[in-house]
A protein has these predicted regions:
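N-terminal acidic, proline/glycine-rich, low-complexity intrinsically disordered segments
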Residues: 1-7
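Beta-hairpin "wing" of winged helix-turn-helix
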Residues: 72-82, 89
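Short, structured helix-loop boundary elements
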Residues: 14, 18-21, 61, 96-99
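Conserved segment of winged-helix/HTH DNA-binding domains
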Residues: 23-24, 89-112
Length: 112
């Protein structure tokens, strides 16, 4: 069994494995946008309104909303509305852990 994929995949057909690889590729593609990583960094402090994310990211509302929507649709962020204010929070802790791990590795490389 390959170290790349977990043991749970041992019973999958080649076609199903292709689906797994495609979904993993989509996940990393979603996170390959620096603005989305910045938004995740901001949301590590807890739930934030769109306006707060916009201010802290230093980006336009249209740009921030586009990225928040993409992350929400992917199941990485939770969204709730209170009156006219929309709040986002990290929902998928596993996705956050992947980002933290990669960021830690990059910081190691930068410091060495």
């Amino acid at each position: 069994m390959s170290k790349l994929v977990p043991p749970e995949t041992k019973d999958l057909s080649p076609a199903q494995m292709e689906q797994v690889f495609s979904k993993v590729s989509q996940f990393f593609s979603l996170l390959s946008e620096p603005s989305r990583l910045k938004i995740l960094f901001i949301l590590c402090d807890g739930e934030q309104s769109v306006n707060t994310v916009m201010e802290r990211a230093g980006s336009s509302q249209a740009n921030v909303s586009r990225h928040l929507t993409a992350l929400h649709r992917a199941g990485i962020l939770a969204r709730r509305k209170e009156g006219v204010t929309v709040y986002y929070a990290i929902e998928d802790e596993a996705s956050l852990e992947i980002c933290q791990s990669v960021c830690a590795r990059v910081v190691e490389k930068i410091k060495s």
